[in-house]
């Protein structure tokens, strides 16, 4: 109601800047109900990048949590012509141009606004990291999110009412789909603002967590840095999913011994909601038993997705040959915000060109080798940075 009463209508954008917090749920679900599009902001970016994203997204409202972030946004908000209102959470308003979030929401009417939401209506607009220039706004719609939740659930569906520890940053695609998937199954998210290995281990045990998503470095920190972790009770923990990089056999072996749960790896990017490939629980067990090279893979395409490895001429290369990883599926984005040429280039022929250099083996497992932009050509041969390293 507060968003609607500020004059925002279906398709309008607003920015949310916060570390992990309960307000993320309010932001995503309340906005989605009325077709207003949240732009979750990476709190690790520099002020100039924040300013660019808020301005580029045409956000009409900015909601900011914490004294530090409010102070930083206040320093450049005069440069944001589209922003009509600034809202602060857990922070003192710098001046009367800011409004407290809970004062703002409590002052609204009790009406229950609703819009007719369609499959192709945007759920959120996340910005890429901008490794090849300015960050690009990725438009993800309702059908994309629903599809990816279902695709991932094929691997983890044995938990009917999950209790998920949300510790990865929710401005990130993987954590967002983890959040959505938990709620979709009637589960509960336990939210940590930041990653602290001791607190994570304590919460996994005391809150009887069933699953969580981390990166391998987080898993490693937990199993090697937490005192007496071997004495903690993790009997309710069913599985841990990780992403961002492969996990080493040593860390996986240690983690399986500590947590006594299954492990899975999801691979994807902002442009496909979160997950294109999945390295299953059984794959991890097989890797430790007899096929350690599997841990270098990011798995096989999830159900409903297709992956081809292509050369510079858009031709599929033989198995085992490195080329660009191209993907198609119901989770692939609609395009980039206000970037028609970049959208056409990235979605050439209806296939998402990921920018990743990879290969597929004879069994259908995908291996990411490099970024295409890091490749050089010498004497007609493609040379990847990892080969040089």
Predicted feature locations:
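Conserved AMP-binding/adenylate-forming
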Residues: 2-45, 382
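Conserved AMP-binding A3 loop
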Residues: 123-147
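Conserved AMP-binding/adenylation subdomain of ANL enzymes
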Residues: 146-163, 171-211, 225-226
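Gly/Ser/Thr-rich phosphate-binding loop
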Residues: 184, 209-214, 223-293, 306, ...
